[in-house]
Regions:
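Active-site neighborhoods and metal-handling regions in enzymes and metal-associated proteins
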Residues: 1-339
Length: 339
């Protein structure tokens, strides 16, 4: 089997008082499944011995700018010993290529955490929806930050450590800004409100986006558009299954939205043709300009490739989701004032 060596911060009683307990090398040996543990300050001195007589050195290429320099110094120290029989690694590989793909597949423990995070986030959205309607019924002023506060309260009340990302609460026309951040605008009766928010729980993210009537009641036009987007989401969920291509949920979404845009008159069939033409020419793009899903896990846009090599020099989007991989499906539609 392999041998694990950990380099970590040394034990420091004074820093423990300020920052919390750190294990240090000695405690790490007894509490973690490693065979050796050293202070991080001796990494450069220990590195040549760890690299010697290994065929490949794996490390993250792009995450720490100084690490490649330190690795190269260690390799040079080994190369200087080649005349004495030492073997220097002949390959350098990016460990993120392995770790990113490993992170895509969650075990049952991870899935349970993510299910709980999603439950907390769903409760937070419902809380904000109810609060918006209640405040408007009472004749109170409603601002976007009022609903943001309701989200954070629900997250923390149920054990979430943080929001998984900066929450978006956008009322009325503000919802047409995809990455809206002001979080201060008024919310009026008759407005639609978009909330894009999810909590982080035990290191795992959730991500939910919903649009709802601020006063609790859709107008006929709002309901028509909402039902169309909901139908596209249902199509995406139905297409998200083990063995499907990653792009399948997006294609299912686009098909429903494109037909719906023709049906409700957002697109004129006399000008753009049938649904196949709308999709081929991307006429839908003025209302739906982004992809439907993304990986979800320890980060809200989790690592892992969306393409895979199919042959030398070419790539394919035919990424087959496996059991335990998490995809966030999020159809939506942007209708700006005046459209």
């Amino acid at each position: 089997g392999g041998r694990s060596t950990l380099f970590c911060q040394p034990k420091d009683i004074e820093r423990d008082i300020w920052d919390g307990v750190r294990l240090g090398p000695e405690a790490a040996l007894s509490q973690l499944a490693v065979q050796e543990a050293w202070p991080s300050a001796v990494l450069d001195a220990k590195l040549p011995a760890l690299l010697e007589n290994k065929a490949v050195v794996w490390y993250p290429f792009a995450t720490h700018t100084e690490l490649p320099v330190r690795i190269e110094a260690g390799l040079n120290a080994v190369r200087a010993r080649v005349r004495y029989g030492a073997m220097c690694p002949t390959q350098q590989r990016d460990v993120c290529d392995l770790l990113d793909e490993m992170r895509l597949v969650k075990d049952e423990h991870e899935l349970n955490i993510m299910r709980r995070a999603s439950q907390i986030s769903a409760g937070a959205h419902i809380r904000a929806m109810k609060r918006s309607a209640a405040m408007l019924r009472a004749g109170q002023e409603v601002r976007e930050y009022h609903l943001d506060a309701e989200l954070l309260h629900e997250f923390r009340q149920h054990g979430s450590q943080y929001p998984a990302y900066g929450s978006i609460v956008a009322g009325g026309a503000n919802a047409c800004v995809l990455h809206y951040r002001a979080d201060a605008g008024p919310i009026l009766s008759g407005d639609l409100v978009l909330i894009d928010a999810g909590c982080e729980l035990d290191g795992y993210a959730s991500d939910i986006t919903r649009t709802f009537p601020a006063n609790g009641k859709f107008s006929a036009a709002q309901r028509e558009l909402y039902d169309l987007v909901l139908a596209s989401q249902d199509a995406a969920v139905a297409a998200t299954r083990e063995g499907a291509r990653f792009v399948d949920p997006h294609e299912a979404t686009v098909k429903v939205l494109a037909q719906g845009m023709l049906d409700v008159g957002l697109l004129d069939a006399n000008k753009v043709g049938h649904v196949q033409d709308v999709i081929a020419n991307r006429n839908y793009f003025q209302f739906y300009m982004h992809r439907t899903g993304h990986w979800l896990g320890m980060d809200v846009h989790d690592c892992g490739s969306y393409v895979e090599p199919s042959e030398v020099g070419t790539f394919s989007e035919r990424k087959d989701p496996l059991s335990g991989e998490l995809i966030k499906d999020r159809p939506s539609r942007v209708l700006r004032p005046g459209m």
